[in-house]
């Protein structure tokens, strides 16, 4: 039975894996350049990063590597993690009162060395946010370090008026697709 290596230090991804009864044998922090390429579409961006992260982690012959990447997009514009509070404020202003996409790429490299990748898109619509709501959310610090500047599993859930697709995708790892990929390479599921 292969051992699972999670190519992510995200506590949210570990929590999500635990929901499907999966506990990584090892955690590794992949080192790759996450800068979007000029003109790169959000779907292509997350697929490239997920594959790059999975392949960047050293793997023993009996190990399977799982990596993921999530981003938020408004149209073709990719919203990465906010650099600072003004950037977070700008992102929340862009998301206010509109629909956006949350894209995740998930990649599993099996014991055969083959990379298997899936892309998942969830549509989220935020209510119109007041300046006071944006100020309070920025002050909470919750949006820092999160793609698109918000955590749907936290205070920002109250901003969501519509969601179409995978909720776990918005948290950071689409569980349906992840479960299928892990099963396809022999990782036992709970």
UniProtKB/Swiss-Prot annotation:
<keyword id="KW-0546">Nucleotide metabolism</keyword>
<dbReference type="Pfam" id="PF02545">
    <property type="entry name" value="Maf"/>
</dbReference>
<feature type="site" description="Important for substrate specificity">
    <location>
        <position position="12"/>
    </location>
</feature>
<dbReference type="GO" id="GO:0036221">
    <property type="term" value="F:UTP diphosphatase activity"/>
</dbReference>
<dbReference type="InterPro" id="IPR003697">
    <property type="entry name" value="Maf-like"/>
</dbReference>
<feature type="active site" description="Proton acceptor">
    <location>
        <position position="69"/>
    </location>
</feature>
<dbReference type="GO" id="GO:0005737">
    <property type="term" value="C:cytoplasm"/>
</dbReference>
<dbReference type="GO" id="GO:0036218">
    <property type="term" value="F:dTTP diphosphatase activity"/>
</dbReference>
<keyword id="KW-0963">Cytoplasm</keyword>
<dbReference type="InterPro" id="IPR029001">
    <property type="entry name" value="ITPase-like_fam"/>
</dbReference>
<feature type="site" description="Important for substrate specificity">
    <location>
        <position position="153"/>
    </location>
</feature>
<keyword id="KW-0378">Hydrolase</keyword>
<protein>
    <recommendedName>
        <fullName>dTTP/UTP pyrophosphatase</fullName>
        <ecNumber>3.6.1.9</ecNumber>
    </recommendedName>
</protein>
<comment type="similarity">
    <text>Belongs to the Maf family. YhdE subfamily.</text>
</comment>
<dbReference type="GO" id="GO:0009117">
    <property type="term" value="P:nucleotide metabolic process"/>
</dbReference>
<feature type="site" description="Important for substrate specificity">
    <location>
        <position position="70"/>
    </location>
</feature>
<comment type="function">
    <text>Nucleoside triphosphate pyrophosphatase that hydrolyzes dTTP and UTP. May have a dual role in cell division arrest and in preventing the incorporation of modified nucleotides into cellular nucleic acids.</text>
</comment>
């Amino acid at each position: 039975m292969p051992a699972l290596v999670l190519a992510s230090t995200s506590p949210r991804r570990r929590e999500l894996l635990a929901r499907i009864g999966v506990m990584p044998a090892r955690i590794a922090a992949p080192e790759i350049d996450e800068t979007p390429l000029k003109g790169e579409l959000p779907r292509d961006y997350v697929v490239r990063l997920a594959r790059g992260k999975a392949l960047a982690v050293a793997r023993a012959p009996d190990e399977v590597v799982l990596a993921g990447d999530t981003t938020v997009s408004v149209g073709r514009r990719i919203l990465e993690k906010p650099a600072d509070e003004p950037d977070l404020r700008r992102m929340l202003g862009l998301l206010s009162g509109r629909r956006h996409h949350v894209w995740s790429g998930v990649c599993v490299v099996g014991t055969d060395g083959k990379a298997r990748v899936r892309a998942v898109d969830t549509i989220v619509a935020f209510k119109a946010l007041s300046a006071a709501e944006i100020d309070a959310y920025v002050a909470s610090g919750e949006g820092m370090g999160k793609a698109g500047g918000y955590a749907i599993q936290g205070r920002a859930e109250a901003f969501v008026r519509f969601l179409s697709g995978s909720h776990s995708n918005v948290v950071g790892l689409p569980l349906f697709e992840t479960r299928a990929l892990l099963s396809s390479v022999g990782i036992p599921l709970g």
